[in-house]
Regions:
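Long, contiguous ectodomains of secretory-pathway proteins
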Residues: 1, 5, 23, 36-172, ...
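Short, polar/proline-rich extracytoplasmic segments that appear immediately after membrane translocation
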Residues: 3-30
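Intrinsic disorder/low-complexity segments
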Residues: 8, 14-16, 83, 98-100, ...
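Positively charged, hydrophobic/aromatic-enriched amphipathic segments
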Residues: 30-32, 37, 218
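Glycine-centered loop-to-beta-strand initiation motif
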Residues: 95, 179-184
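N-terminal propeptides
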Residues: 158-167, 183-294
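Solvent-exposed serine/threonine-rich low-complexity stretches and specific carbohydrate-binding patches
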Residues: 173-179
Length: 294
């Protein structure tokens, strides 16, 4: 970086332990600085006179990340990964985020070939409030069929869920959305828009319970509810018939009809090889159920 008059020499970035950099002094229209990072990527930082900062990083594999941050705190990040998938995250000055991602045919094909999920090139932060939860619009290639997709989440927990936003505005928790170490995973059959929420329940009797993570997982998805808004009763027992019903509900089985309330769930469990259908009234611990489902 060239020294500014009267300010003395500015040390080279490499001498300070970072990558090399070059640029020009501040002008009425702003400043531009380019840095070569230790991993070989190159970052170009442009600062406009109004305080807007645009940072663009180009990696050795050709992928790029461009983030524009305005003085009011709003920002837009655009990503294109090496497979050709793209993603954009817009965050307004109040912190409300919306994201869009288009997954490339190459990314989908490679993931399916390896038995993996396609990771979307966006990252959002889950919210406990549906009104402020980030929305993510996911575009899949035509004729992609059922595709496992991972949406990176900065604060993922066992109670983090994807919520499907239908075209009419109604919302539905995706029961099979699964938290991973750094994302939420769901299976999609075509393009869709989802919200990412922390739907964990605050049960006072599970805060220090050994099955807390499992209980957070199942209660957030409505698979096993508490006996009230604040009590889960993890040590209470339930029956095998109730467990069959929970499992069938998790898999969206049709449980209408039947001569007794659990008959359809019992038949479903037998058909799937989950249970022999015996002893429907035998007891099982609610904490054990949660762990089994988790």
């Amino acid at each position: 970086i060239e020294p500014v008059s009267g300010a003395g020499p500015v040390p080279d970035a490499a001498a300070c332990g970072g990558g090399s950099s070059s640029g020009r002094p501040s002008t009425s229209t702003g400043k531009t600085e380019t840095t070569t990072n230790p991993d070989g990527s190159v970052t170009k930082t442009e600062t406009k006179s109004d305080g807007t900062v645009t940072e663009t990083t180009t990696n050795k594999d050709g992928s790029t990340t461009k983030t524009e941050t305005k003085p009011d705190g709003s920002s837009k990040t655009e990503v294109k990964d090496a497979s050709g998938s793209t993603g954009t995250v817009k965050t307004d000055k109040n912190g409300q985020a919306t994201a869009e991602t288009t997954l490339s045919s190459k990314a989908v094909e490679d993931a399916k070939k390896n038995g993996e999920a396609v990771k979307a090139p966006v990252e959002v932060e889950a919210s406990r409030d549906s009104n402020t939860a980030p929305t993510v619009k996911v575009e899949l290639p035509k004729n992609a069929g059922e595709t496992a997709v991972e949406i990176p989440v900065s604060n993922v927990k066992p109670g983090t869920v994807a919520v499907l936003v239908h075209p009419d505005g109604t919302e539905e928790i995706v029961k099979n959305s699964l938290p991973t170490e750094d994302s939420i995973r769901l299976t999609m059959d075509g393009s869709a828009t989802v919200k990412i929420m922390d739907n964990s329940k605050d049960f006072i009797d599970t805060r220090a319970h050994w099955a807390k993570d499992a209980i957070d997982f199942v209660s957030a998805r409505g698979l096993v509810n508490g006996i009230s808004d604040t009590i889960y009763a993890p040590n209470n027992s339930t029956t095998r018939a109730q467990l069959w019903t929970i499992l069938a509900r998790q898999n969206d089985a049709d449980l209408t009809g039947g001569s007794i309330w659990y008959e359809k769930a019992q038949n479903w469990a037998k058909d799937k090889g989950i249970s022999d259908g015996a002893d429907p009234n035998a007891a099982i611990n609610r904490g054990q159920i949660a762990t089994f489902l988790y």
